[in-house]
């Protein structure tokens, strides 16, 4: 299970905690990134529970956050000669997106904790692009996604397994205009060469049970 979320998110919702607890009981391998925010909070929660079936993905020489040294440290190779990926001594957003894409490819399904917009330090609206990309990259591979949409917590964890349903229920009805504009532009520019992965029906039922 690939767990991701907005960097700006500070807390893990109770519904998500329950889902992660159920994943641990089933001994699923949990894939998580190394960013602050949700990544770090999920790591800390799994560390506190002494859960070992965890893989932390990163692009640098070592993870920025790595709560348990017994976990799998999974580095995604990035060409540091490419300024789109490594500039001024730092890995770029594009490099981090390669890491996230690898996690989407490796996972069987995903759980996303998402607030689609926040205000940056200049007071302008900023779209949480990484989590949205993760949702899209999972869905186009026919992989289930459980989405906890932070602005509407009463909806709990919403379940999706195709792009059309996600667009109808979330993009068209819930998100801010800036997010909607970004999403359709991203979708337009996305590669048409993504290979689809069909998941056995038995796995679908088991995975969906986590998002009750």
Regions found by a protein language model. Give the residues of each.
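STAS-typified acidic loop motif
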Residues: 1-8
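Acidic, PIN/NYN-like endoribonuclease modules and their adjacent C-terminal/linker elements
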Residues: 143-192
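Acidic/glycine-enriched connector segments
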Residues: 9-164
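A conserved mid-domain beta-alpha-beta active-site/ligand-binding segment of alpha/beta enzyme cores
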Residues: 81-92, 178-204
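Positively charged, lysine/arginine-rich intrinsically disordered segments
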Residues: 208-212
């Amino acid at each position: 299970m690939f767990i991701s979320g907005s960097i700006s998110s500070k807390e893990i919702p109770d519904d998500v905690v329950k889902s992660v607890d159920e994943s641990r009981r089933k001994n699923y391998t949990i894939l998580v990134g190394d960013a602050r925010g949700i990544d770090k909070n999920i790591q800390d929660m799994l560390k506190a529970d002494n859960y070992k079936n965890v893989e932390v993905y990163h692009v640098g020489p070592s993870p920025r956050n790595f709560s348990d040294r017994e976990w799998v440290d999974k580095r995604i190779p990035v060409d540091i000669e490419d300024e789109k990926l490594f500039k001024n001594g730092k890995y770029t957003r594009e490099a981090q997106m390669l890491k996230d894409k690898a996690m989407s490819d490796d996972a069987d399904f995903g759980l996303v904790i998402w607030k689609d917009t926040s205000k940056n330090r200049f007071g302008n609206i900023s779209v949480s692009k990484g989590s949205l990309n993760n949702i899209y990259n999972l869905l186009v591979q026919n992989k289930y996604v459980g989405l906890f949409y932070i602005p509407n917590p009463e909806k709990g964890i919403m379940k999706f397994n195709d792009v059309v349903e996600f667009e109808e229920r979330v993009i068209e009805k819930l998100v801010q205009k800036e997010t909607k504009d970004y999403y359709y532009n991203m979708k337009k520019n996305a590669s048409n060469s993504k290979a689809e992965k069909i998941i056995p029906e038995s796995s679908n039922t088991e995975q969906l049970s986590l998002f009750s």
